[in-house]
Design a protein with these regions (language model features):
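N-terminal short beta-loop-beta anion/metal-coordinating cradle
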Residues: 1-57, 63
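Short glycine-/acidic-enriched loop or helix-start segments at secondary-structure transitions
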Residues: 14-17, 78-80, 98, 157, ...
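Active-site-proximal beta-strand elements of phosphoester/diester hydrolases
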Residues: 40-45, 144-147, 191
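Structural motif
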Residues: 66-69
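Mid-sequence, gly/pro-rich, charge-dense loop/helix-turn segments that line enzyme active sites
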Residues: 77-165
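A C-terminal functional module that forms or caps the active site or interfaces directly
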Residues: 148-190, 195-199
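His/Asp/Glu-rich mid-to-C-terminal helical/loop segments that flank catalytic regions of hydrolases
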Residues: 198-226
């Protein structure tokens, strides 16, 4: 099986890569490995939606994969998903995609600039309706995500986004990854490990090492059982 792991930064897959065997065909962004009978490429896109969409689309246009995994860290809006928890994100949306109207916010769909179900959107969200069949993936809790350019760290804006979308987690790349996969018809799964609770910015409370270790273990299990 040919598998692609997409990540924003090398640090987020630092616990996965040592479990793979380096192979030929490595570049600065797209590195090749093997595990058992699988060929595993790792694409490092850089942080944010623009970089993720651009590099994913470029690779998808010239390469074919049996499954694509997005591995990264995220912030959690739910106490039931504490740092170190790995989540299978099956729906995502771009939280800031719209316009301000005084104190109100209008989504791009509410502005009638984009249809609620205009491909690849479903009811204003990006939905992975047919994730890969994988025993390790099936064991993960499923969550709804938002993708942002500005990570939340203000109590008022956190309250507003929870009221509007009620998300489980947030990241800076997930929706762009899902958009590219849906457009290109690539089987995919977005897998994220919680590094912090979404609250007023408090780096001392973050558990990045625990999140990266948990993410690496989860991604390796998915690859191993593919």
């Amino acid at each position: 099986m040919r598998i692609l792991v997409v990540t924003a930064t090398d640090a987020e897959v630092a616990a996965l890569v040592p479990s793979l065997v380096p192979a030929a065909g490595r570049t600065s962004r797209l590195r090749s490995y093997t595990h058992d009978r699988h060929a595993v490429d790792v694409l490092t896109t850089g942080v944010g939606m623009v970089a993720t969409a651009m590099w994913c689309s470029g690779v998808f246009a010239r390469e074919r994969y049996d499954v694509v995994l997005n591995g990264g860290v995220c912030g959690s809006f739910r106490p039931a998903l504490p740092p170190g928890t790995v989540v299978h994100v099956t729906t995502d949306r771009i939280a800031e995609f719209g316009a301000e109207d005084g104190e109100a916010f209008l989504t791009v769909q509410e502005l009638q600039l984009l249809g609620e179900d205009e491909f690849p959107w479903t009811c204003g969200r990006l939905v992975n309706s047919v994730p890969p069949r994988n025993g390790a993936l099936d064991q993960l809790p499923v969550g709804d995500a938002i993708t942002v350019n500005t990570v939340h760290g203000n109590e008022a804006t956190i309250a507003r986004v929870v009221e509007r979308y009620n998300p489980h987690v947030e990241s800076m790349e997930g929706a762009a990854f899902m958009y590219a996969c849906l457009v290109h018809g690539v089987p995919f799964a977005q897998v994220r490990a919680v590094s912090n609770i979404v609250e007023r910015r408090n780096r001392n409370a973050w558990k990045l090492r625990e999140a990266v270790d948990a993410l690496g273990a989860a991604l390796f299990a998915i690859i191993d059982r593919s």
